[in-house]
Amino acid sequence: MEKRLVYNSVVCLICGEHLVSRHRHDFQQCSCENGAVCDGGLEYERFGAKDLEAIQSFCVYDDEPHEVIRFYVERGSRGKNMDEELKYIKLKDVDDDHLKVIIKYEEEIRPNNRFLKIYKTEVKYRKKNK
């Protein structure tokens, strides 16, 4: 099976901005003269800059050990009542109850979501590493 992106980012080594592209065509650009860019979300890796030597591309794929993946997989959340500003939470920081709700939702609504397996692996990881 082909490996797939779970995290797509670029760091501009001139200004230090860390750019994260979370979804297809989520074009991000730093604010300095180097104009570092990151695009493609979790569909493809695209990066650039005026000086390519002054950027560092950092991507994580689903063939990495779960101990690594859990630090980079993110889930958007608007809070329990869906009334909060969107924020992204790393899988390692999602509380157990929230993780159970996520898994239940994905199983019922989006059973083919490629992250469902990662969420279930996180439950096993937590049980094993308590």
Residue ranges and their predicted role:
Residues E64-K130:
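Short amphipathic alpha-helical interaction elements located at domain edges
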Residues S9, D26-Q29:
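Residues immediately within or flanking Cys/His clusters that coordinate Zn2+
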Residues M1-N8, G40-F71, F115:
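Short, intrinsically disordered terminal segments enriched in charged and Pro/Gly residues
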Residues G16-L19, N34-C38:
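Cys/His-rich microdomains that often coordinate metals
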Residues H23-H25, C32, V94, R126:
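A short, structured loop/turn motif at beta-sheet edges
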Residues S21-H25, D39-E43:
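Short Cys/His-rich "knuckle" micro-motifs
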Residues C12-C15, C30:
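Short cysteine-rich clusters marking metal-coordination/redox-active sites
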